[in-house]
From Swiss-Prot:
One of its GO terms (biological process) is regulation of metabolic process. Keywords: Cell membrane, G-protein coupled receptor, Glycoprotein, Lipoprotein, Membrane, Palmitate, Receptor, Transducer, Transmembrane, Transmembrane helix. It comes from Equus caballus. Receptor for MSH (alpha, beta and gamma) and ACTH. The activity of this receptor is mediated by G proteins which activate adenylate cyclase. Mediates melanogenesis, the production of eumelanin (black/brown) and phaeomelanin (red/yellow), via regulation of cAMP signaling in melanocytes. Signal peptide: none annotated. InterPro entries: GPCR_Rhodpsn (IPR000276), GPCR_Rhodpsn_7TM (IPR017452), Melcrt_ACTH_rcpt (IPR001671), MSH_rcpt (IPR000761). The lineage of its organism: Eukaryota, Metazoa, Chordata, Craniata, Vertebrata. This is Melanocyte-stimulating hormone receptor. GO terms for molecular function: melanocyte-stimulating hormone receptor activity; ubiquitin protein ligase binding. Changing S83F: In chesnut color. Pfam families: 7tm_1 (PF00001). It comes from the Eukaryota. A lipid is attached at C315 (S-palmitoyl cysteine). Interacts with MGRN1, but does not undergo MGRN1-mediated ubiquitination; this interaction competes with GNAS-binding and thus inhibits agonist-induced cAMP production. Interacts with OPN3; the interaction results in a decrease in MC1R-mediated cAMP signaling and ultimately a decrease in melanin production in melanocytes.
Length: 317
């Protein structure tokens, strides 16, 4: 990845595939509409990264401390927190280095900066891939716990879970290394976009099926109590709201980034696509928001984990 000065984000591998065209600026041609670029202040970006960092460290600490949380589901949640932690840490580190370079506080050789650039890019890309994998793993774990409840412990045996976790981390590191090494190949971007779509479809199918089963179970209970409509409708609305939050957060936070990659494949030099490319930092900010929201959705809803977290915070004082 050729360095283009300190103004370039270190995560240039995926963004630098965009050819240098006049479409990246505000269009000067009166026949073309001006581009809308959402400016993300560096302070806000760093603040979101630090909040996510602290939040996910607390999740990992709570799960590690409480042996009651040493189960397959919480292991996946813990790994998701580690992935989100790495996403936040790498983005904060990248931004801090850029700010130091721009301020002239940090001076280093171009070759050293190039190596640091590659390492951070691999770290960011690998943590993104692992985050998506563990989001899918949590969905699969919940699906098995509902549809194969009697066989859950025989299916989700700890050795098997640990092998799956190790495999996810290994694949994430290897794939991110290949992605960064061959970032200028269309096949790399296509693989990333396909992977995101596959995870989105997997989560949507599993969670919708779980919601349908839960509503069916609620109808059966309602018929027994002869209160079919109030119970079923209330439960269905609550379940639909939960499903909307789960998939909505996933799509809104991750979708724009992968839309960016898709447009790099489809229309790298089109002026409209160029307007989208200008908001690359916004898309990374949304991924940081996902790293903040994930613990709220998957971890902090557990009463046991909240209790452990409270003990950890009290002990720290």
């Amino acid at each position: 990845m050729p360095l283009q000065g300190p103004q370039r984000r270190l995560l240039g591998s995926l963004n630098s595939t965009l050819p240098a065209t006049p479409y990246l600026g505000l269009t000067t041609n009166q026949t073309e509409p001006p581009c809308l670029e959402v400016s993300i202040p560096d302070g806000l970006f760093l603040s979101l990264g630090l909040v996510s960092l602290v939040e996910n460290v607390l999740v990992v600490t709570a799960i590690a401390k409480n042996r009651n949380l040493h189960s397959p589901m919480y292991y996946f949640i813990c790994c998701l927190a580690v992935s989100d932690l790495l996403v936040s840490m790498s983005n904060v580190l990248e931004m801090a280095i850029l700010l130091l370079l721009e301020a002239g506080v940090l001076a280093t050789q171009a070759s050293v900066l190039q190596q640091l650039d590659n390492i951070i890019d691999v770290l960011i890309c690998g943590s993104m891939v692992s985050s998506l994998c563990f989001l899918g793993s949590i969905a699969v774990d919940r699906y098995i716990s509902i549809f194969y409840a009697l066989r859950y412990h025989s299916i989700m045996m700890l050795p098997r879970v640990w092998r799956a976790i190790v495999a996810i981390w290994v694949v994430s590191v290897l794939s991110s290394t290949l992605f960064i090494a061959y970032y200028n190949h269309t096949a790399v971007l296509l693989c990333l976009v396909t992977f995101f779509v596959a995870m989105l479809v997997l989560m949507a199918v599993l969670y919708v099926h779980m919601l349908a089963r839960a509503c069916q179970h609620a109808r059966g209970i309602a018929r027994l109590h002869k209160r079919q409509h109030p119970i079923h409708q209330g439960f269905g609305l609550k379940g639909a709201a939960t499903l909307t939050i789960l998939l909505g957060v996933f799509f809104l936070c991750w979708g724009p980034f992968f839309l960016h990659l898709s447009l790099l494949i489809l229309c790298p030099q089109h002026p409209t696509c160029g307007c989208v490319f200008k908001n690359f930092k916004l898309f990374l900010t949304l991924i940081l928001c996902s790293a903040i929201v994930d613990p709220l959705i998957y971890a902090f809803r557990s009463q046991e984990l909240r209790k452990t977290l409270q003990e950890v915070l009290l002990c720290s004082w």
